[in-house]
A protein has these predicted regions:
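DNA-binding patch around the recognition helix
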Residues: 122-125, 150, 193-195, 199-221
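Short glycine-rich hinge loops at helix-strand junctions in the catalytic core
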Residues: 25, 166, 203
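Protein kinase-like catalytic domain
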Residues: 68, 116, 163, 199-202
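Short, Lys/Arg-enriched segments at the junction into DNA-binding effector domains
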Residues: 2-3, 113-169, 173, 220
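Conserved N-terminal glycine/acidic-rich loop preference
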Residues: 157-161, 185-193, 215-220
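Residues within helix-turn-helix
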Residues: 106, 173, 189
């Protein structure tokens, strides 16, 4: 069973979410503030972190940033509808996805499972080169100028999707469906924030923005 670290300061929401996830087959450890969440993470890294944006003391964005500095574990942010700016900051800090409160319990469990599937899915295919960038799908390794890059599972899946469709413009909606697994309407900010982070690692020129259409990776030369 997958282990979830739930960091949420509201006792009612924390307990309701814990019960929901456990009923759906997850093993859940909880924390009520940012530092307690980091301590719990260090005691035994979970399979996925469910992290509230607004926390007392150290906020969720700071917690996300600290976890991401040492781990590629999937992170999903919990946010109120009024926390749009904080959600963007969380995505920029390395979160893989977010869920808006209030949420339907089945939707939350489905989103966590989708993120976990993306994180564990093994790709097939031959090595690909794009200038100084090399992608090894079988080993799930990406290197730039011979140096292996540290990518989160979502960043890796996004790069691989672009690479496997090199030269083709993929819309944000296509990327949401193929990378995030959304068959319903999703927030295209997820795509934009992850492209921005990915460019910071693979090079600003590696991924081209096609205005009004989407993104593409140039065909290997």
């Amino acid at each position: 069973m997958n282990r979830v670290l739930l960091v949420e300061d509201d006792p009612t929401i924390r307990e309701m979410t814990r019960m929901t996830l456990e009923r759906d087959g997850f093993v859940v450890e909880t924390a009520g503030d940012g530092q307690s969440g980091l301590d719990a993470f260090d005691r035994g890294p979970p399979d996925i972190v469910l992290l509230d944006v607004m926390l007392p003391g150290m906020d969720g964005v700071s917690v996300c940033r600290r976890i991401r500095a040492k781990s590629v574990v999937p992170i999903v942010m919990l946010s109120a509808r009024t926390d749009a700016i904080d959600v963007v900051l969380g995505l920029e800090a390395g979160a893989d996805d977010y869920v808006t409160k209030p949420f339907e319990p089945p939707i939350l469990s489905a989103r966590l499972r989708a993120v976990l599937r993306r994180a564990t899915r093994m790709a097939e295919g031959s090595r690909m080169r794009f200038g100084d960038l090399e992608i090894d799908p079988k080993g799930m390794v990406v290197a730039r100028e011979g140096i292996v890059l540290s990518l989160t599972p979502t960043e890796y899946r996004l790069l691989l999707e672009l690479a496997q469709n090199a030269g083709i413009v993929l819309s944000r909606e296509q990327l949401l469906e193929n990378v995030w697994g959304y068959v319903w309407s999703g927030d295209t900010r997820l795509v934009d924030m992850h492209v921005r982070r990915l460019r910071g690692k693979v090079g600003a020129d590696a991924i081209e923005t096609v205005r009004g259409a989407g993104y593409k990776l140039a065909r290997p030369g």
